[in-house]
């Protein structure tokens, strides 16, 4: 049977408990990308256990606690020669870099994966009966006194799970987007970016499109949604199809054009389907020319903000285009952008400095602008009217 990924110990032997768990994930329909993500979390945990010389099935809450402490202070491994990334805001985009430490979202994902791993082996009878990653023990059930008129709030259930930090989606301003677009070096790259910023599709969804999925006549492109694997047609801008046609004319006769052939190819021989990593490097090169650090996913955020700010487009329509399961996720794009708020605040300070906005200082002579009328005070304290 085909196994997308295997976890090996220092001797090069397959770690059988992880192999069984990954097979179960494959059996319930989890994609290879999910198996890889779970495998990386398990590799981090097993490396910790190998360092402290504790077998995986003898790990206790103490090891889980120490692992949670270690992952907070440990530096992420990096490739040889790669520069150290600093978690400081980029001067162009305002986005902070990934930094040297593990992000709270990474630590939370790791805790959930490891708890699920031990739950699986406990249910299968092949692991310890007590999960080393416990849940939070409370004296009452969750949402015991919840007001039915309010939305349910997420409650922390895992003991060692870090506090969730709501990340603000980043949008590429129109003038900066034009500068990034001007740095793209081929019609294929321009077509890809134009589709991403007009459809709001995820990077992997658009890269997985086939030749027959593009319908210029209806101005639609078909993608397979991440997670649900649902097939959905997405409307795209006219200029995206113009760039697509120029790219197809450039590659005519060089790549196959059957209906089920890939839509996106590399530009050099041997021609192979364009991968996510190649597209990521393409967009990174365009960013580097401007000193920016926007990601491919920021193009999806940009499309979402543009559609959500259109008064003639309902929020439910935006939800359908983006493929969100809950409307509350789409509502994030109704919040003002950070750069817009900063610009408004700076403009306010400029107006105050210019004297066009009245200052709220109390004059030295004369009554305070917030003082009560003397007649009201006389009536209040029983002195009558003057």
Regions found by a protein language model. Name each.
Residues 225, 322-347:
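Catalytic-site neighborhood detector that most strongly recognizes the C-terminal catalytic loop/helix
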Residues 164-203, 207:
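Basic, Lys/Arg- and aromatic-enriched nucleic-acid-binding interface segment
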Residues 199, 204, 208-242:
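Conserved tyrosine-mediated DNA breakage-rejoining catalytic core shared by Y-recombinases
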Residues 177, 237-292, 384-386:
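Active-site/catalytic core of tyrosine-dependent DNA strand-transfer enzymes
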Residues 65, 127-179, 224-227, 265-271:
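Flexible interdomain linker/hinge and immediately adjacent N-terminus
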Residues 348-386:
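C-terminal secondary-structure termini that scaffold catalytic or DNA-interacting sites
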